[in-house]
Amino acid sequence: MVATTEQTVGKITQVIGPVVDAEFPSGKLPRIYNALTVKGTNPAGAEVNITCEVQQLLGDNQVRAVAMSSTDGLVRGMEIIDTGAPISVPVGKSTLGRIFNVLGEPVDEKGSVNVNETFPIHRPAPKLTDLETKPKVFETGIKVIDLLTPYRQGGKIGLFGGAGVGKTVIMMELINNIAIQHGGVSVFGGVGERTREGNDLYNEMIESKVINPDNPEDSKIALVYGQMNEPPGARMRVGLSALTMAEYFRDVNKQDVLLFIDNIFRFVQAGSEVSALLGRMPSAVGYQPTLGTDVGDLQERITSTKEGSITSIQAVYVPADDLTDPAPATTFAHLDGTTVLSRGLASKGIYPAVDPLDSTSTMLQPNIVGQEHYKTARAVQSTLQRYKELQDIIAILGLDELSEEDRQTVDRARKIERFLSQPFFVAEVFTGSPGKYVTLEDTIKGFNMILNGELDDLPEQAFYMVGNIDEAIAKAEKLKKG
């Protein structure tokens, strides 16, 4: 049903924190999810401009709404206007290179946005008949991901990792590669994270040329932020605002889109705060009773259609490292793969620090990726697993005490570990090494050559921070000549 755009005026009857109750004329009640606005001056002479979203119809012509910004300055009796439609955000090329809040207002002090079209943030998921059901691998050009945890086009990937292990750099490299190789764009939803991190990310994107501040429409990404200091209503809806911008690129521009959500746990946390404010009975561990529905409403819209795809990378915070907590447990049910970043690898200087043994993907099946890819990936994992098992023996007794076969395994595993590292385009400014995009074919060929013993005579440092295997061979020649 299409919402009418007829505007009705009501009166505020109660304000408790971010929750606003209002009374409307009989027969003219706003619908659930309609946006209500309060504009003007309050009796104290303070300017007020607040948008709320209707959550409950209370009876007696009363509605309960949740504010998207601070309710400071609101008083009982003020006029509140029903806009007749849900919150809508700008969509299209004009959003690229800009930072928006949950309402689609630019917050980067770069002036207004030339808005030709807006979309409501509450939209149905694509119909089953419109979905692309054949699983298709999304090539990222990053060796460790393409070989061991291949991403599904239109899939959802959880990105797990602590501070300083390289989540942001991987995100920026993916943004860069989808723009160059797939002609796609990206949308970043900053949900309930630190304002400083949002600012750092924006500046890093300018530095690595993902955002062009002089001509924003040449940028490869749109950013939507609802940071930690925002009211729970904004943090709960900012993910939907980002997703709506991504849906336009998929459905109207027919592009492949990357959607980053950082952090999906904060989305659930905000929903739980709103649920308590609305007086709902909490369920397990204090979460909202509608946890499954809330997460499902967001995740079901992230998918591949016959026109284009939205592939989503979601940073997942695990509270107290408890994977059975309802928030991460509900999220896991929707994920097609997990990319786990390891502090141990980062401390060795191996970047991207993706853990090859802990990371998983539902796409790593012979009937999807092919027999050769599957066998190579499994052989790489078993070699690394054996190396991990032998590390205690090596630490106590040294390499010389190992059997000939185990020594060979260790030698190849160390080469594999180094070959899983790769110079990134977005890190060129820091490393001084030109970035490399490695095709899946080259990746499989390289690892097969290491596993088959064809490169046993090359030094292991030749495999560190190179693109394909030919570069490793050339680097070995260079090292030989000194």
UniProtKB/Swiss-Prot annotation:
Keywords of this entry: ATP synthesis, ATP-binding, CF(1), Hydrogen ion transport, Ion transport, Membrane, Nucleotide-binding, Thylakoid, Translocase, Transport
EC number from the UniProt entry: 7.1.2.2
GO molecular function, one term: ATP hydrolysis activity
GO cellular component, one term: proton-transporting ATP synthase complex
Compartment(s): Cellular thylakoid membrane
Pfam families, per the entry: ATP-synt_ab, ATP-synt_ab_N, ATP-synt_VA_C
Taxonomic superkingdom: Bacteria
InterPro entries named in the record: AAA+_ATPase, ATP-synt_VA_C, ATP_synth_F1_bsu, ATPase_a/bsu_AS, ATPase_alpha/beta_chains, ATPase_F1/V1/A1_a/bsu_N, ATPase_F1/V1/A1_a/bsu_N_sf, ATPase_F1/V1/A1_a/bsu_nucl-bd
The protein's enzyme class: translocase
Signal peptide: none
Quaternary structure and interacting proteins, as annotated: F-type ATPases have 2 components, CF(1) - the catalytic core - and CF(0) - the membrane proton channel. CF(1) has five subunits: alpha(3), beta(3), gamma(1), delta(1), epsilon(1). CF(0) has four main subunits: a(1), b(1), b'(1) and c(9-12).
Entry function: Produces ATP from ADP in the presence of a proton gradient across the membrane. The catalytic sites are hosted primarily by the beta subunits.
Family to which the UniProt record says this protein belongs: Belongs to the ATPase alpha/beta chains family.
Protein name: ATP synthase subunit beta
Organism: Gloeothece citriformis (strain PCC 7424) (Cyanothece sp. (strain PCC 7424))
